């Protein structure tokens, strides 16, 4: 858990998380060597957010805005990250990754996780302008605009061999795989989800 937060701090330039004499690196690379549990029981048996979230550690997306957009390679190596939780209805670029530009995300599963933001919200990535492959997300995603089970928005990016199981809700541009795409490619992706669009 600590290493994952440290990596997010490294990419985002957050000295409060990434302590020591470290320079921000938005092109940093990482490869998981084990599964990671951040929180336990984020979602109940019905897939809804747990009743008591007071003890949860909040997640900050890797590449959490345009200035910190991620361009490295993140290889999950077949492992899972469990229990990511973020709940702020005024935040953009929300997901495991917030904003990817030229980066590569592969071979990782995100389970028992909840993301709620304002715009560009996705289980894997809020705004994908890179390459995502062989990943999955089991959880709940919600927001106002550009909301997707895997990616909230995807322009000039690609998504392949990925799947989503869970619930996604948004007011507009909402989809099970991706909320909005432009000059992007989606191949061999599927979902099993409830979709609620046109709601707050």
PLM features: residue spans?
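Surface-exposed repetitive/solenoidal architectures
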Residues: 1-200
């Amino acid at each position: 858990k600590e290493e994952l937060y440290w990596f997010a701090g490294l990419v985002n330039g957050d000295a409060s998380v990434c302590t020591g004499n470290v320079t921000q690196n938005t092109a940093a690379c990482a490869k998981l060597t084990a599964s990671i549990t951040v929180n336990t029981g984020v979602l109940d048996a019905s897939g809804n957010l747990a009743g008591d979230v007071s003890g949860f550690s909040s997640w900050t997306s890797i590449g959490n805005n345009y200035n910190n957009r991620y361009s490295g390679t993140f290889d999950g190596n077949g492992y899972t990250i469990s229990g990511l939780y973020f709940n702020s209805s005024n935040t953009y670029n929300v997901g495991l990754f917030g904003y990817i530009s030229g980066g590569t995300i592969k071979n990782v599963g995100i389970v028992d996780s909840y993301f709620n933001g304002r715009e560009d919200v996705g289980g894997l990535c809020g705004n994908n302008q890179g390459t995502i492959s062989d990943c999955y997300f089991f959880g709940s995603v919600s927001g106002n605009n550009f909301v997707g089970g895997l990616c909230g928005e995807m322009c000039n990016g690609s998504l392949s061999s990925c799947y989503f199981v869970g619930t996604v809700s948004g007011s507009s541009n909402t989809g099970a795989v991706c909320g909005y795409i432009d000059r992007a490619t989606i191949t061999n992706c599927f979902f099993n989800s409830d979709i609620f669009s046109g709601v707050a």
